[in-house]
Amino acid sequence: MNSELSVPAAPARLQQAAAPFLFLLLGTVFATWAARIPAIRDAQQLNAADLGLVLLCGGIGSVLSFPIASFQIGHFGARKATLQSGAALLSILALQAWMPTPVCLMAGMLAMGAAACSFDVAINAIGAELEKAGGRSMMSMLHAWFCVGTFGGALLGSVLAGVQLDVHWHFALVALALALPLWLAFGALPHDAPDAALGKRSFALPHGPLVMLGVIAFCGSIAEGSIGSWSGVFLVDRLHVSDGVAPLGYAAFAAAMLAVRLVGDRLKERFGARAVVATGALLAALGVYGTVAAPTVTLAVIGFALTGAGVATVFPFMFSAAGRYGAASLAGVATMGYSGSLMGPPVIGFVAHHFGMAAGMLLVGTLNLAVAAAAAKAKALD
């Protein structure tokens, strides 16, 4: 990706809003899907293991998407890759609720995982270049807009589930509402040149100082992905809440994550990325353990909020650090992180099926402790 950015002719406000909107779009799609997982599970008559297998397909799709992301950025640049993968993501979301069988749902998740990860890599490549061009930390703020999307999407999902709007209409309306803004954001993004070197590369795991970043990204993102996929099911199955209340756990998680990401860049400048990520991971572990022990819905939701606050800086600081090593390094680390966020939920599903939902959530808390230990030693973060 060319570090010299030229700005296309577009209104100044639209130029400034383009990159934040792309992160908001991704968060909205995630939350829209997550908010209706209980309804889709019931419609397809899936048990915890079956649902875990469906979610595993999303993880597989994310892992397989690296060659797609590399091809797109290498041949078209991150700007065009954003439009291509974003349009695919919205189309797949609209179709997901129409999948007639679990097998079709798995195929849809495979495609959704690939499209979402390709979109994520592209917009973070854009964010890293904007950060580099501006000479200041801004990745946490960009990821805060992802949280705005997840929070808004979760609240909208709660309202629409509460009024019993059909999932088919819910997904279709969200996809349609985001399509035009995606096109406008694409038109306002800074032009970039294709990265020919990245386009010729095959998949390669992070190496050298990036190994620890990849491990932190993988383990840390399991918590974020697992809360998105299982928080509603946890509240329904363990505390017997309604489908309208179920998305509130994820809404609290997203709101707390948003609050921390709004000040994340300042925390990084004052304390350093390693200290912020390590401390946050400890807080996230405390939140998960508190949620499992919570006897009431209110306390469980507070636990989800603490978890969101704790994991808030993992992704933005990981992307920022990897971006300093170039687009190829960012894509490799991002793929490991994205694999964790999408492969974690099915693992939690299998654990929940055999040992109970509480055991699955406890695993998430333990992984956060591992992130805290690893982050304290990851010099590449700073």
What feature does the model see in each segment?
Residues 35-49, 229-245:
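Short amphipathic helix-loop junctions that connect adjacent transmembrane helices
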Residues 65-78, 161, 260-272, 352:
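Helix-to-loop junctions at the C-terminal end of transmembrane segments
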Residues 325-367:
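A late C-terminal transmembrane helix in Major Facilitator Superfamily
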Residues 97-108, 292-302:
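Helix-loop junctions at membrane interfaces in 12-TM secondary transporters
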Residues 168-187, 359-377:
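Symmetry-related core transmembrane helices of the 12-TM Major Facilitator Superfamily/SLC fold
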Residues 80-94, 275-290:
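Structural signature of the two symmetry-related core transmembrane helices
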Residues 108-144:
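Cytoplasmic helix-loop-helix junction between adjacent transmembrane helices
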Residues 64-103:
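Conserved MFS/SLC helix-loop-helix module at the cytosolic interface between two early adjacent transmembrane helices
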